[in-house]
Structure formats: C-alpha cells, structure tokens
From Swiss-Prot:
Protein name stated in the entry: Uncharacterized protein C9orf85 homolog
Domain of life: Eukaryota
Lineage: Eukaryota, Metazoa, Chordata, Craniata, Vertebrata
Modified residue annotations for Phosphoserine: 136, 144, 146
Coiled coil: none
Keyword Acetylation: yes
UniProt cross-references to InterPro entries, sorted A to Z: DUF2039 (IPR019351)
Compositionally biased intervals (Acidic residues): 136-155
Gene source species: Rattus norvegicus (Rat)
Region annotated Disordered, chain positions: 1-22, 108-155
C-alpha cells in the first residue's frame, strides 16, 4: 500500500490468498490445547467474547499460571486469562469481567461452583464401590442358594 497522502483505499485484492484455514491443533495435540479449545468464555460482553475466541482460534490464548489481582476487591482471585475482575465482583456489579464495561453479558456466570477434579474422582470411586457392593450382593445370593440346596440334600 502506498504511503502517498490521501491514498487510503486499496485498489487491488490480496496478493497471496491462503488455501487452507489455520488449525490451532494441527501440530499441537497437547492436553493444554484441548483444554483451551474446550473453554467456555462466560461473564464477558459480545466484543470481548469474540476477542477471546479469536485468540483461541489462532493459538494466541495463553492461560494464567497463577491467579491475578482483581481490580475491585484487590484479592488474587482472577483465574481467567485476560480478565480484570473476579467472578463474584463481575456478577455483583453486572459488568464484563474482561473490559469492565456495563455491556450485555452474552453467557452469564454459573451460580453453582465449578466441579473440581477431586469431586469427579470421588464420583468414579463411588461408582466403583457401588459396583463392588452389587458384585458382593450377587456372591451372597449365590452362597445362600447353594446353602439351601445343601440342606435339602441332607434332609
């Protein structure tokens, strides 16, 4: 594009056009990339949501390694990247957690606490223990049936 004064419009199309779209997980199939791709951007306005989705789409999104300080409560409670406010403060003030403006929130925060990895593992342990109980109940039923047959043959 020329730097000539007043020449602000481009008169020709783009010289090199990409034939394939960029795939952020084509060569990087790590767990971190999968988590980033699956992340739900809630509590932000439409513009901030589009910005965050663009960052994810083109591998520019970097998750936080440790919590940041909230600009409202001044506690280290901001766990989402590129956000300036923690979830409780953003919910209470009904503002975007990323830009801080009173825009319409596209996807509001969930009221219930997020399920942690510990509760998930407890649930799977619960399923295992239930299955063990069922197996042991079946064993007990089989043993009681065989005892009943023994009594019939002895009498």
């Amino acid at each position: 594009m020329s730097s000539q004064k007043g020449n602000v419009t481009r008169s020709r199309p783009q010289k090199h056009q990409n034939t394939f779209t960029f795939k952020n997980d084509k060569f990087d199939k790590s767990v971190q990339t999968k988590k980033i791709n699956a992340k739900l951007h809630d509590g932000v306005c439409q513009r901030c949501k589009e910005v965050l989705e663009w960052r994810v789409k083109y591998s520019k999104y970097k998750p936080l390694s440790k919590p940041k300080k909230c600009v409202k409560c001044l506690q280290k409670t901001v766990k989402d990247s590129y956000h300036i406010m923690c979830r409780p403060c953003a919910c209470k003030l009904e503002v975007c957690a990323k830009c801080g403006k009173e825009e319409e929130i596209v996807i509001p925060f969930n009221k219930e606490p997020e399920p942690s990895e510990n509760t998930e593992s407890e649930g799977s342990n619960h399923r295992r223990s239930c299955k063990r109980k069922e197996d042991s109940d079946e064993d007990l039923d089989a043993e009681s049936d065989s005892e009943g047959e023994d009594e019939d043959t002895q009498a």
